Amino acid sequence: MPLSNLKISFLEMSHFNKWSSSRLAQGLSASAGMALVLLALLALFFGLPVRAATQSNTILIVGDSLSAEYGLRRGTGWVPLLEKKLAAEKVPAKVVNASISGDTTSGGRSRIAALLKTHQPSVVVIELGGNDALRGLPLGMTEANLTAMTQAAKKAGAKVLLLGMMVPPNYGGAYGADFAGLFSKVAKAEKVALLPFFLAGVADVPDVAAQFQADRIHPNEKAQPKMLANVWPELKKLIQ
């Protein structure tokens, strides 16, 4: 075979290799795209939440003054202590504290959709309800709001931890039992994690005054590690 023909053959082979590689890459890309579409369709068909592949391990805390460092030095509340705990435990998680002093379950319910969309959390901690009781709001409203928030978080693909609260004895035994019970009722109905009493070891001890600020409503700096100690065992189960 003449040398000139060999050169042409090599050139033709080079063009063929480039063409076949390009077609193969296009085929693989199309296959990957079809696989993602199929997974999304299956998830929708079976009612499973579709979560972004880049979703980070984010813990969203939706609470009131108990989680917003009311009356405390910055960095001493239980939420900043949680961030330090995660770092010490080498847990790669980000904490977003969306707590607002004075907030009620109605306020939390009005904010939850935007918070879920913005932060795409893997875990949502709901610490609300105390201000509902202080304002004498209907228990049915509090329960409905907690249920709606829990369902929204679950629909977004997040795990949920409810932090239960109790009211002082002067509210009456029947009201106190019903109020404390609504947290477990919601948790059981929605199949989510529950911490029965967020302020255990803080508000139910003989020397209560030593654990609270002068207003006798908000835990002081000394109480914050105990509050974290209450939350951590339940939260740890959700982030492992």
Model-derived regions, located:
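Intrinsically disordered, low-complexity and often Lys/Arg-enriched segments
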Residues: 2-33
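Alpha-helical cap/lid subdomain in secreted, periplasmic
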Residues: 5-6, 12, 17, 81, ...
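Bacterial N-terminal signal peptides
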Residues: 31-47
